[in-house]
């Protein structure tokens, strides 16, 4: 059994077993028709800052180059592979990759700061093919891990974002809530702030007087600014916040529905029926549920969905840019991180794509450092 490790040390992986696993998985990928792709270990930081924001510096290792500017050690494969794919002519592709990624970890984490990953990315330009590719991605990981005693958990970010889209609030508030879905504490603070249940007129005035007005005064005193935003940008942002806090707040019933939805969990087989009976009946939410039902139906033809878990908010703290179907595989011992995770990231494709290139994508990664000698006890 793998003992809990602190700090950034690697799990003690048997190199021979790990080598066999890598060869085995590579063979599975090749038989499935995937093409190997390589991307640099050192990336241009600006390409990732637009995605992660300044939080990137808290998660990744950055350095400054006198010629190339700010650089970052590869924190994952998805974004650099997507950028590489977008430079090509083909819209459809199925890639697999292997190599190291580097991420800062907390002292208590058992995930090494340098870890070896394998995985894949599917790109497609046919909108009606997304659900089939979701299922294909899940089954590919399921096949790889079939010899291990691992259980899977699934989620669907689209259900939550579509529910937010149906709220009777401004587009600014909707975008703000969706942007912070992956940061639960920030999201809940925003939800409380935008909610009529927790934010009275007095509290709004108090919030404005204690956090916004002083900044207006201080803004006049600043002579120089660091960062991307200009003085005008900051001033406009303060004015927008003032306006948003004074009108169109979230109704109690909508807030309660959203909170209930975020707590929902069941077996995958029971989830469609339970969620479809919800009171939110807007078009966006209905479409998300229809897609969910189709995906579960297709998955049920290949796996026992009664033993697959479903949580609406699964992966929100770790799968930053996923916006649809998400999944993970976990060993029975909950002290370990998910051995594999993946999901759909169409919005990321849309934001990084050039005009005329409308593509969707789903991908998954495997933590190979946990598939060596230290996990042999988990095999059947």
Where are these regions (language model features)?
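Positively charged, Gly/Ser-enriched RNA/tRNA-binding surfaces
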Residues: 2, 14-33, 37, 43-44, ...
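Glycine-/proline-rich flexible loop or hinge segments
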Residues: 5-12, 57-70, 118-122
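Polyanion/phosphate-binding surface patch
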Residues: 40-71, 106, 111
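Short acidic, glycine/serine/threonine-rich loops at helix termini
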Residues: 50, 108-111, 164-168, 376
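Acidic, His- and aromatic-enriched active-site or binding-groove loops in soluble protein domains
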Residues: 57-67, 169-199, 331-332
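Short, conserved phosphate-binding/catalytic loop or strand-edge motifs used
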Residues: 114-119, 155-162
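Intrinsically disordered, low-complexity, charge-biased terminal/linker regions in eukaryotic proteins
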Residues: 147-148, 161-164
């Amino acid at each position: 059994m793998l003992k809990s490790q602190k700090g950034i040390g690697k799990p003690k992986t048997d190199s021979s077993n790990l080598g066999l696993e890598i060869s085995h998985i590579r063979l599975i990928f090749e038989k499935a028709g995937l093409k190997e792709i390589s991307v640099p270990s050192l990336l241009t930081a600006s390409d990732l800052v637009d995605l992660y924001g300044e939080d990137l510096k808290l998660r990744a290792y950055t350095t400054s180059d006198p010629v190339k500017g700010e650089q970052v050690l590869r924190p994952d494969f998805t974004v650099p592979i997507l950028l590489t794919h977008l430079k090509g002519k083909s819209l459809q592709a199925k890639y697999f990759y292997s190599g190291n990624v580097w991420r800062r970890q907390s002292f208590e984490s058992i995930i090494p700061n340098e870890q070896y990953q394998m995985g894949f990315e599917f790109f497609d330009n046919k909108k009606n093919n997304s659900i089939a590719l979701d299922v294909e991605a899940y089954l590919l990981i399921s096949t790889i891990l079939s010899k291990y005693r691992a259980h899977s958990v699934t989620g669907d970010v689209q259900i939550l974002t579509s529910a937010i889209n149906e709220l009777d609030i401004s587009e600014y508030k909707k975008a703000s809530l969706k942007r912070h879905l992956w940061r639960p504490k920030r999201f809940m603070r925003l939800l409380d702030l935008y909610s009529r249940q927790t934010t009275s007129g007095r509290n709004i005035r108090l919030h404005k007087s204690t956090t916004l007005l002083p900044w207006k005064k201080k803004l006049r005193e600043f002579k120089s600014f660091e960062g991307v935003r200009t003085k005008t940008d900051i001033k406009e942002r303060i004015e927008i916040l003032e306006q948003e806090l004074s009108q169109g707040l979230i109704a109690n019933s909508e807030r309660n529905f959203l909170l209930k939805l975020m707590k929902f969990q069941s077996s995958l087989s029971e989830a469609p029926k339970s969620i479809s009976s919800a009171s939110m009946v807007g078009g966006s939410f209905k479409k998300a549920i229809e897609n969910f039902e189709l995906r579960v139906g297709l998955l049920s033809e290949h796996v026992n969905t009664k033993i697959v878990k479903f949580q609406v908010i699964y992966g929100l703290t770790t799968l930053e840019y996923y916006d649809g179907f998400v999944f993970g595989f976990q060993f029975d011992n909950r002290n370990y991180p998910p051995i594999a995770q993946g999901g759909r990231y169409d919005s990321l494709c849309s934001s990084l794509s050039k005009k005329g290139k409308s593509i969707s994508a789903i991908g998954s990664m495997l933590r190979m450092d946990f598939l060596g000698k230290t996990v042999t006890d988990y095999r059947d």
